């Protein structure tokens, strides 16, 4: 918790939002809570023809005739603690990002910051960088303010608990689970009202993005349960629900708003996503037309993702294709992404104090490229970690016969993703067909074809495989086709 004198000193330079109804929603196993939402319902008091005067209503109460909402997106103010040129800053820059492996997290910042000073725990005064929106019932932003704040969270929820509250609002059921952790006795009604309204606003924001051409491909996240020795005992999957979408949409709104607020002509850190590979997309479309109902949407989604460009950090704004945004940045996770910390510092210079950036565009671009490289290395490490634990898991299932689908085709065989565990392994070309047969790789049609009898194995085909062997040191799984497969 922050010392009283630090709060007393900081509140003079910040917007005091400790009375705003505020909560966090995070994964159940999260240890740091670096973003929060606040919600208040405002009423239109009068209009003078030039603008509106807003009158704050009772905390969290239901609005009457003309609902107008104040929604705050509050991000832990890491830049207050991590100053440029310090050892902590240098180490964070070298890492570029936190790395999330199956059995551990390698944090970008020290634990004292992640899990204490910058963790927005309920009932504690915390320093934030915030984007505070005034929105109408159609999710239109009437005005916004980017500012440094002091907040005090009322509730800490995980995604399942938040979803329970949302569903209770939709079905009229009694709220079954709640985690006050410092919330007041009137918090239940306020929380239900806040989540109900925010969920409606988020759905409208999401619908607008999709209408503008945003990609909406969603994939379940593979998770492992480990025993006390770190051995996987279960593989399970987490699917995005309305609570995930709620948080996602308001984080996207904050990121986009900050990027637009900076304007053009000043060096800035954008998150950009170029157009996809047109030739690859045409191949995907042709494949879909040819296969018709024989190909699943999951396979088409997989190919569409593979055709996309990689999102990167850059001072050159080309927009974000996947989100259908003309301006976009990363502002909402400075505790785990160094570019967000750079953005917070630039916001302080440009918007809060009106000072110029101390770095040239070339220097800032070098930092962007470094952070993009760190991100890609971290993503590869995370993929490798998942593959390792898949191999450990499948090593306990040698000899089992299991159903799956072809998830990738190459000149040396094809990959199969098992239907239940979704572990992926290789059926090598030497284990396909009969001795003497020649298998040819048809790259455009994503298949292997036998030259002698034209039998083929195509991306997305259902197959039954036998777990042949696992190389844990190399994180590799080998399958062979089951007899009569």
Residue map of PLM features:
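C-terminal structured domains
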Residues: 452-454, 458
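Short, structured beta-strand/loop micro-motifs enriched in basic residues and often containing a Trp
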Residues: 441-450
């Amino acid at each position: 918790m922050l010392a009283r004198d630090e709060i007393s000193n900081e509140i003079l330079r910040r917007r005091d939002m400790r009375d705003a109804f505020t909560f966090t929603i995070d994964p159940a196993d999260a240890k740091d809570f670096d973003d929060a939402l606040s919600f208040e319902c405002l009423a239109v008091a009068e209009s003078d023809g030039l603008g509106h005067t807003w009158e704050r209503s009772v905390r969290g109460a239901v609005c009457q005739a003309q609902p107008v909402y104040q929604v705050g997106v509050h991000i832990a103010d890491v830049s207050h603690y991590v100053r440029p040129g310090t050892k902590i800053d240098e180490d964070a820059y070298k890492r570029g990002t936190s790395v999330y492996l199956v059995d551990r997290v390698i944090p970008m910042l020290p634990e004292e910051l992640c899990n204490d000073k910058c963790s927005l725990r309920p009932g504690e005064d915390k320093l934030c960088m915030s984007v505070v929106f005034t929105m109408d019932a159609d999710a239109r932003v009437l005005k916004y303010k980017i500012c440094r704040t002091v907040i005090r969270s009322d509730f800490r929820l995980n995604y399942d608990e938040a979803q329970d509250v949302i569903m209770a609002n939709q079905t009229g059921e009694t709220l079954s689970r709640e985690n006050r952790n410092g919330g007041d006795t009137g918090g239940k009604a306020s929380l239900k009202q806040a989540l109900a309204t925010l969920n409606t606003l988020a759905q409208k924001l999401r619908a607008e993005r999709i209408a503008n051409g945003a990609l909406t491909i969603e994939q379940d996240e593979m998770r492992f349960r480990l025993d006390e020795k770190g051995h996987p005992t279960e593989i399970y999957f987490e699917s995005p629900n309305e609570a995930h979408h709620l948080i996602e949409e308001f984080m996207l709104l904050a990121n986009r708003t900050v990027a637009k607020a900076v304007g053009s002509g000043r060096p800035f850190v954008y998150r950009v996503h170029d157009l996809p590979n047109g030739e690859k997309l045409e191949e995907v479309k042709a494949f879909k037309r040819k296969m018709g109902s024989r190909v699943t949407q999951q396979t088409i989604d997989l190919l569409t993702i593979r055709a996309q460009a990689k999102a990167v950090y850059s001072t050159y704004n080309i927009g974000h294709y996947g989100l259908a945004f003309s301006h976009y940045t990363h502002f909402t996770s400075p505790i785990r992404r160094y570019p967000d910390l750079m953005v917070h510092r630039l916001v302080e210079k440009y918007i809060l104090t009106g000072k110029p950036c101390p770095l040239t565009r070339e220097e800032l671009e070098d930092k962007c490229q470094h952070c993009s490289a760190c991100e890609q290395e971290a993503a590869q490490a995370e993929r490798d970690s998942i593959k390792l634990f898949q191999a450990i898991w499948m090593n306990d299932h040698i000899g089992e016969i299991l159903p799956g689908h072809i998830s990738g085709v190459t000149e040396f065989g094809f990959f199969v993703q098992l239907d239940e565990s979704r572990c992926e392994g290789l059926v090598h070309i030497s284990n396909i067909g009969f001795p003497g047969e020649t298998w040819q790789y048809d790259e455009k049609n994503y298949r292997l074809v036998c030259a002698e009898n034209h039998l083929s194995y195509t991306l997305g085909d259902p197959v039954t495989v036998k777990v042949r062997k696992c190389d844990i040191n190399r994180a590799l799984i080998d399958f062979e086709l089951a007899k009569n497969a």
